[in-house]
């Protein structure tokens, strides 16, 4: 209790220091004071330390320096200091950045180190990090520390920060099948993810309604499965752009191709892939999940996932495995015959497991790891020990905290999404419901809790497209972002509300149409451009 009171006292003291400490997400350790330094936009620059492993030419940081300079001051020129009245003697016109290990051309991974320290005092203005990914997180924090007075002068307060994420996987899922999202919308989302220190873009590319992914091996999938094969697709170049744009912001791209269910859009492009449904003894003309009884199915999956494994460089692929409806399989006489030959009886979970086990073997043969939805675990599919289980069901078959207990007790790593479905909306400040979730509040040993590697906010697309995506995402997704980054003791709702309200105004200033948290105003309101 004493440590909790001390932590809250530190939070309260920091809050009283003013706008300079309205950070989101809140750092692990911070000391700040009222002493402030002026920044002159025309003079300010980011600079590599002479001993830094990263130097000019580092794509990740070179672009980040320009990006954050524009975010802080805009791209125009500012009045010269002598035109602004009194010249301030305490100035900070250089942020020195030092990175310990090289890696400017690499991709972020689950194991990437994102720690950083930020020191702003009379002697130095220094950002120190182990990796370029930590430097990116520190640059975002630095950008939020800078504030502008009513007279238009930029300041930053004396501050010391030691920061690191609580969880290594802090994700956001976008569904681009139920409604197509333009490429620009995805890129904009990646920007705001970086502002929130989220680091995994879970791209739910395809589903029953549409197949917008352009496969170079099976182009008919897109041609016959997308809403429009000209306007509503993601080309190979689009995918490359998303991956690189994300990389430059320290964000992994986790691509999901969900099977055997959620695959109706695959059928038109690959005849024979889906299971024909029967009405009595005759085909009904409708189709169900992928047909797991045919060798052709696995030949197709081998070729398709070989392509996917080469297109998406992250070590992990998301293979879905959720919500498989057995009705069509049960109606099909060929499926029934296959099950008899395999000795499955009438247990269709065994049939599902047979398909998924075969698919997992295919994907692992390409040197990939995989993430699956919780049904794969619930249905007792034999999976590799390094499989990551994503928990998404709130109460079925058990409460999601019980599910986390069971998954980790079995020795598997887990991701939590169940309480963080942002597409579900309600009147009032529902961000609080997301914020108060404690991912480790289940019965289990310390070893079990160490297997929870993070979580994801999910934005499913039944009722969300480009017209309402941004205000529904932000700042609500920020509540999940802080829960996954900050210390467990950073949990006071009043303190969170004050900072998130300020951050929402900062998002408006940055051109993000983030919805309000309650009654109030921002100095710079959002204007449609």
From Swiss-Prot:
Biological processes annotated in GO: carbohydrate metabolic process; ganglioside catabolic process; glycosaminoglycan metabolic process
Disulphide bonds in the chain: 58-104, 277-328, 505-522
Signal peptide bounds: 1-22
Pro-piece positions: 23-88
UniProt entry keywords in alphabetical sequence: Disulfide bond, Glycoprotein, Glycosidase, Hydrolase, Lipid metabolism, Lysosome, Signal, Zymogen
Cross-referenced Gene3D superfamilies: Chitobiase/beta-hexosaminidase domain 2-like (3.30.379.10), Glycosidases (3.20.20.80)
Residues with glycosylation annotation: 115, 157, 295
Subcellular location: Lysosome
Enzyme class, broadest EC rank: hydrolase
Catalytic site positions: 323
EC number: 3.2.1.52
Disulfide bond as UniProt keyword: yes
Record has Signal as a keyword: yes
InterPro entries: Beta_hexosaminidase_sua/sub, Glyco_hydro_20_cat, Glycoside_hydrolase_SF, Hex-like_dom2, HEX_eukaryotic_N
Regulation: Addition of GM2A stimulates the hydrolysis of sulfated glycosphingolipid SM2 and the ganglioside GM2.
Region (Critical for hydrolysis GM2 gangliosides), start-end ranges: 423-424
Catalytic reaction(s) noted: Hydrolysis of terminal non-reducing N-acetyl-D-hexosamine residues in N-acetyl-beta-D-hexosaminides; N-acetyl-beta-D-galactosaminyl-(1->4)-beta-D-3-sulfogalactosyl-(1->4)-beta-D-glucosyl-(1<->1')-ceramide + H2O = a beta-D-3-sulfogalactosyl-(1->4)-beta-D-glucosyl-(1<->1')-ceramide + N-acetyl-beta-D-galactosamine; a ganglioside GM2 (d18:1(4E)) + H2O = a ganglioside GM3 (d18:1(4E)) + N-acetyl-beta-D-galactosamine; a ganglioside GM2 + H2O = a ganglioside GM3 + N-acetyl-beta-D-galactosamine
One GO location term (cellular component): lysosome
Pfam family, one: Glyco_hydro_20
Recorded GO MF terms: beta-N-acetylhexosaminidase activity
Quaternary context: There are 3 beta-hexosaminidase isozymes: isozyme A (hexosaminidase A) is a heterodimer composed of one subunit alpha and one subunit beta (chain A and B); isozyme B (hexosaminidase B) is a homodimer of two beta subunits (two chains A and B); isozyme S (hexosaminidase S) is a homodimer of two alpha subunits. The composition of the dimer (isozyme A versus isozyme S) has a significant effect on the substrate specificity of the alpha subunit active site.
PANTHER family on file: BETA-HEXOSAMINIDASE, BETA-HEXOSAMINIDASE SUBUNIT ALPHA
Recorded family membership: Belongs to the glycosyl hydrolase 20 family.
Role, per record: Hydrolyzes the non-reducing end N-acetyl-D-hexosamine and/or sulfated N-acetyl-D-hexosamine of glycoconjugates, such as the oligosaccharide moieties from proteins and neutral glycolipids, or from certain mucopolysaccharides. The isozyme S is as active as the isozyme A on the anionic bis-sulfated glycans, the chondroitin-6-sulfate trisaccharide (C6S-3), and the dermatan sulfate pentasaccharide, and the sulfated glycosphingolipid SM2. The isozyme B does not hydrolyze each of these substrates, however hydrolyzes efficiently neutral oligosaccharide.
Protein name listed in UniProt: Beta-hexosaminidase subunit alpha
Chain's gene name: HEXA
